[in-house]
Amino acid sequence: MVLYYILIPFAWLLWHIGFRIHVEGRENLKKVQTRGCIIAPTHVSAIDPVFIVVTRWGRRMVVFAKKELFEINALLSWFFRCCGAVCVRGTREEVEVIDQTVEACRQGRTLLIFPEGTREKERKLLPPKSGLFVIAAQAGVDVVPCRILYDTPDGKMRLFCKVRVIYGEPMPAAQFAMEGRRDMKKLRANKQALLDTWVKMV
């Protein structure tokens, strides 16, 4: 915990030296600042999680990340773990972690999930996966759509480029309540609603 609050100001300074970060929609974060929520960003670069952490560093988060994120290099792997990153491998232990995360959200913690499941290719948004909405339904928390845009010709991350981090209007928890685990119609509607919101965030 102490190490987190030492590292994040350092990361904030380093990231603001390396990139021109512009945050939009802070008022939407204020709507969920007193309760648990899930932040659901688009995914372009391996370092996308850091942009979310440094633009909301006052609230410690649980970060769901694929194992590839921990394989970039040892230093980044250590940093991500210090920031609360949980490696997603699909193991039985992960089920326990998810249960603990759901309970943490109920207790007021913020969860960061990249719903696309992998990084975008050729500036094309990918449809969000269902896991985000299942967790939101179990925890009973709002989902905050987020889009990360790199102002470069190909939309890829480049050092010293302008980076827009846009937070949208929270999607209310009541929207995710499901009558049963196989309520596919509602899942499809929520996935499309999030994708449509991302498209409008330009």
Q: Residues of each region from the PLM?
A:
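A generic structural signal for well-ordered alpha-helical segments
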Residues: 14, 56, 80, 104, ...
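Helix-to-loop junction immediately C-terminal to a conserved catalytic motif
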Residues: 4, 11-43
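Non-catalytic C-terminal accessory region of glycerolipid acyltransferases
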Residues: 96-202
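Short, basic, glycine/proline-bearing loop/turn elements
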Residues: 14, 82-88, 115-118
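Structural signal for hydrophobic
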Residues: 23, 79-80, 143, 167
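Catalytic core of membrane glycerolipid acyltransferases/transacylases, capturing the structured
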Residues: 31-92
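Glycine-rich, highly charged phosphate/nucleotide-binding loops
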Residues: 20-24, 92-97
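Alpha-helical membrane-targeting segments
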Residues: 1-20, 71-83, 156-162
